[in-house]
């Protein structure tokens, strides 16, 4: 028997079975929770790279970084204020989030096929899977109190990063090989 806490501070026991050296929980009334993400409350945020450049959505719906004073962030709020939805995760791997923007239509950041883009969609209330192209794990960076990194839930070891291409600083998905890689570090300034 395994114990699980319930709301009235009592312990409810769940039956278990060993079958072929594997432990299985026996669901009572089919109420065991499967792996999934459940949407919680959003936060409105400005995301910056370590060069203090602001992430914004370009006219082509692409995520790029640009030098921008705070007053310009306010003037361009639909393109610079991101809606970070937090999700309850049935596994413990970090704070599960989606990153969306409401600019004409709602768009949500995706790393499908390891390519960063915005999909025209509202973040779903529930995602019945343990990985998704739109879920990232937001974590603090060890040794950096105010720095955040976002790991893909679909591609373990791959993080959102800032990369200079031609004259633009783009948001990309990158395998992190080195804990000192500053391109995968961001600051998140909450607006609400």
Swiss-Prot record:
Propeptide cleavage-removed residue intervals: 1-35
CDD domains registered for this protein in UniProt: beta-trefoil_IL18 (cd23298)
The keyword Cell division belongs to this UniProt entry's keyword annotation: no
SUPFAM superfamilies (alphabetical): Cytokine
Modifications after synthesis and translation: The pro-IL-18 precursor is processed by CASP1, CASP4 or CASP5 to yield its mature, active form. The pro-IL-18 precursor features autoinhibitory interactions between the propeptide and the post-cleavage-site region, preventing recognition by the IL18R1 receptor. Processing by CASP1, CASP4 or CASP5 induces conformational changes to generate critical receptor-binding sites. The mature form is then secreted and released in the extracellular milieu by passing through the gasdermin-D (GSDMD) pore. In contrast, cleavage by CASP3 inactivates IL18.
Gene3D superfamilies: 2.80.10.50
InterPro entries, per database record: IL-18, IL-1_fam, IL1/FGF
GO biological process entries: cellular response to lipopolysaccharide; defense response to Gram-positive bacterium; establishment of skin barrier; immune response; inflammatory response; interleukin-18-mediated signaling pathway; positive regulation of inflammatory response; positive regulation of NF-kappaB transcription factor activity
Site (Cleavage): 35-36, 70-71
Pfam families from the UniProt entry: IL1 (PF00340)
Keywords linked to the UniProt accession: Cytokine, Cytoplasm, Inflammatory response, Secreted
Subcellular location: Cytoplasm, Cytosol; Secreted
A cellular-component GO term for this protein: extracellular space
MF terms (GO), sorted A to Z: cytokine activity; interleukin-18 receptor binding
Assigned protein family: Belongs to the IL-1 family.
Subunit-structure text: Forms a ternary complex with ligand-binding receptor subunit IL18R1 and signaling receptor subunit IL18RAP at the plasma membrane. Mature IL18 first binds to IL18R1 forming a low affinity binary complex, which then interacts with IL18RAP to form a high affinity ternary complex that signals inside the cell. Interacts with cargo receptor TMED10; the interaction mediates the translocation from the cytoplasm into the ERGIC (endoplasmic reticulum-Golgi intermediate compartment) and thereby secretion.
Function field: Pro-inflammatory cytokine primarily involved in epithelial barrier repair, polarized T-helper 1 (Th1) cell and natural killer (NK) cell immune responses. Upon binding to IL18R1 and IL18RAP, forms a signaling ternary complex which activates NF-kappa-B, triggering synthesis of inflammatory mediators. Synergizes with IL12/interleukin-12 to induce IFNG synthesis from T-helper 1 (Th1) cells and natural killer (NK) cells.
Protein name per the record: Interleukin-18
